[in-house]
Amino acid sequence: MTSTVSGTETSLRSLRDRPFELLKELEKRSRAVTVGNAPQTSAGREWVGVAFRMGGETFLVAREETREVLGYPAVVTRIPGAKGWVKGLANVRGQLLPMLDLRQFLGSGATASGRNTRVVVVNHREIPAGLMVDEVLGFRRFAEAEFNAEAPPTVIRCDSYLAGAFRRGGEVWPVLSLKSLVESQSFLQAAS
């Protein structure tokens, strides 16, 4: 048993610098342990998203719209003539990725870079983008029956990019559509 625990710790440690892969591995292991113990939802189907904090608010993005989650890169090269919310380009495993401050793009001030700051990489075929957020909270699962197409009001002005919300108990989780965001004219006009 000790060797199994040691092997598990080692493989998880190897994912320490790749937060999204770490979350996926933890999810996989959790599912393996709870297979057969998990209650079926009345709706039968579930929605999985990545939860993150921006300002003082929490949001969700669909797992399918998220390629990965990164720590904020140590080196980001500024792009002359770009708007303030365009932080620059980062070399991520040999690929150039535009780094963008999501909160600043939405007009709610700049995101302070700290140890919890993360970059949510958008899973879009034509528009590569890394969106800087205050913190990623991990995966959240909801029954489809918990979804409401009416988005709640938010302090951060992002209404045109909200695709509804999930409600559970007293909590409301607005769903931000990354596809709508990156395909919007405001987003595509990054030059100042």
Please identify what each model-predicted range represents.
Residues 1-192:
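An acidic, low-aromatic, low-complexity terminal/linker signal
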